[in-house]
Amino acid sequence: MAFPAPAFSLANLLNGSYGVDTPEDMERLRSEQREEAAAACRNYRPLPAVDVSESVTEDAHSLQTPDGAPAEAVSDEFVTYGAEDYLEKSDDELLVAFETMVKPMRIGQLWCPAFNKCSFISSIAMARALLLAPRTSHRTMKCFEDLVAAIYTKSDFYYSEECEADDVQMDISSRDVPGYSFEPWSRTSGFEPPPICEACDMIMYQCPCFDFNALKKPCAERTFADDYVIEGLDGVVDNATLLSNLGPFLVPVKCQYEKCPTPTIAIPPNLNRATDRVDINLVQSICDSTLPTHSNYDDSFHQVFVESADYSIDLDHVRLRQSDLIAKIPDSGHMIPVLNTGSGHKRVGTTKEVLTAIKKRNADVPELGDSVNLSRLSKAVAERFFISYINGNSLASSNFVNVVSNFHDYMEKWKSSGLSYDDLPDLHAENLQFYDHMIKSDVKPVVSDTLNIDRPVPATITYHKKSITSQFSPLFTALFERFQRCLRERIILPVGKISSLEMAGFDVKNKYCLEIDLSKFDKSQGEFHLLIQEHILNGLGCPAPITKWWCDFHRFSYIRDRRAGVGMPISFQRRTGDAFTYFGNTIVTMAEFAWCYDTDQFEKLLFSGDDSLGFSQLPPVGDSSKFTTLYNMEAKVMEPSVPYICSKFLLSDEFGNTFSVPDPLREVQRLGTKKIPYSDNDEFLFAHFMQFVDRLKFLDRMSQSCIDQLSIFFELKYKKSGEEAALMLGAFKKYTANFQSYKELYYSDRRQCELINSFCISEFRVERVNSNKQRKKHGIERRCNDKRRTPTGSYGGGEEAETKVSQTESTGTRSQKSQRESAFKSQTVPLPTVLSSGRSGTDRVIPPCERGEGTRA
């Protein structure tokens, strides 16, 4: 029993009833098509040629329609071009004519309506006959091409009453899209024969070689409103109402695209582009918009407030020694930045400042981990470490090299600091449990918008003397190089001569990233971490007595800050300045990561100290809670995660190679640093400039694709505008070009005073007065002819002669009045050298102070 084919409806289309044909339906459709084609060939007879002048006796212009409108003249071009001429055309020519007249809609490789040669030629013959027949209707018949299309699609032969044949069709689309035009299209019967595959003679929807995704892709950008328009409705109708009322409310629309005309009005270019000239005001505006709390930040007197205000702190087992403090640190002044980027002044290691830093960095050790079997679990973690990261064959064939040469390099490096082979102590006679302590005078830039409520606390350094570090550093350096040589290919440690962040043949795009942020990393380490390091060092080949010795004096230690007079005992936490700091932090991070995540799911793994970054094709799977419950770490999985490690973004160029780019936000903050010492010849400023150039050597590799990547990563990480990052790159390009451009960012108050006091006018006169008195100022006695260095003037040959105020030794018999008069007369005004008006600029007048004379204006 044959069931009728399902009718076309939205419900049948959604539930899959429509469009699924059985083999019986396919055979029935093919037989019907064969019968229609045979009938068309049998019934077709070419019409006899008709002379237009004989068949139409009346004048074309005199022929009137019932409504009084003149009839449209018939074009001879289409009348004389009979249907028999189309029978002689090739298939390609017929396809061109079909596209010209019917204008089918192309969907992928399909046409709607489909091309049928017999139906197309029959439509042409019928259209020719209709144009020659007398007109009895008051409606305007379509032109020849539109009439052929109407006959072929079985639609209306006449134009609608609203628009005539010679009028321009109106765009009835609800959206004004340049280049697109939407024309009304009458409804058809809805039946279209399915396309047949030429290869397997099956319906194309059921053919295995039919690419349905290719059919969906060109239609993905089309919307519901492009195919249908609303008729006769008042108000806004939602999509649900439209879908439930398709029939009575909607009219099909035919969409076609034409080339957009060239605009006659040119759009003015945007003046705020990254390629425009960069000035200091633009860089400051970038800082103000990106770092809103940093632009008004000034900590010139913050430490004064700390020292003078009431202070309360809670520490256990702290020892204070206030008898031999260093009250003042000699300082010759620093360069003043023009940019205000929130950088702080250098911190002085006073007692209160050191106690505040110890409270944050060393005291209050968190206790987040659970109770575990330390010996058993530490061995398991070390075993997982070697399985995940180490190539066993390379480790077995590798050994220690360059230990002695590393020791010699270390001694040569610190030779200028007074370190020599004769000063090396006997380690067995030294108490290695005592560490020196200090705070970093330079505070790390803050990228969060919290400077208005939070004062950054400086970091601390716990270290041994250079004479002790020099005997452990060569061993750990050689061991670290061996460790790098034995790593698997996908593991990268971006430090040293062997490895870096440059990865050839690896693209960071289209990959999942995993970045773990470990807070309070140094002071959170305990005995469990120390045992893990001991097992790993023994496995890497470090001599067991040295490993045992090193771990023993890290179990309990005592730190002391001699400058601040503060001492405090500490236990297992990391010593931030000894020979094993970076190596130890790196292997601890790698061991924790291997226990929490399966390293085989990552294509690349990067580790550096407490920083880690992984790349994978699929979302990483692991348990990050073990960082807290097992390792006593405050861990945070960065979301959204971007390729960022060691304060650098990782970008890929067009060739699939990855390189590192320093964080633009931190580099802009470094442009406003206040730690550059002042010097007359700008040697310290030039050294800082060379460091800036070395960090930004990546600028030559930045293409537009890399700039777009950096903007996206910058916006994802900081939730700030990515366009600001592109503007920062323009500023970096300017200030790395030459040293003169970089000098615009800094000035000195000394130079300002020098420019104020350096002037030359022809009306200025100098009167010399003999004076042989001694001068005294700030408790230092000098003669007037004593030599001392003075800042160089702004004129060639102009040296300022600055004299010190001296005062003769007073006796008990002199009165106070005579002392004031003598002191007043001995004071002189410092004046610059005045050029003689009758000599050239190369000659100069000898300063009067060098002759032992006073100067008076």
UniProtKB/Swiss-Prot annotation:
Which residue spans adopt a coiled-coil conformation according to this UniProt entry? none
Q: Which UniProt keywords apply?
A: Nucleotide-binding, Nucleotidyltransferase, RNA-directed RNA polymerase, Transferase, Viral RNA replication
Per the record's keyword annotation, is Nucleotidyltransferase included, yes or no? Answer: yes
Give the reactions, separated by semicolons, that this protein catalyses. RNA(n) + a ribonucleoside 5'-triphosphate = RNA(n+1) + diphosphate
Any one GO MF term held by the record is: RNA-directed RNA polymerase activity
Enzyme Commission no: 2.7.7.48
GO BP:
DNA-templated transcription; positive stranded viral RNA replication
Q: Membrane spanning segments where?
A: none
Q: Where is this region: Disordered?
A: 775-857
Q: Where is the RdRp catalytic domain?
A: 511-624
Q: Does the keyword Transferase apply?
A: yes
Q: Mark out the compositionally biased spans (Polar residues).
A: 804-816, 824-840
Q: What does this protein do?
A: RNA-dependent RNA polymerase which replicates the viral genome composed of 3 RNA segments, RNA1, RNA2 and RNA3.
Q: Record's family?
A: Belongs to the ssRNA positive-strand viruses RNA-directed RNA polymerase family.
Subunit composition and interactions: Interacts with replication protein 1a.
Q: What is this protein called?
A: RNA-directed RNA polymerase 2a
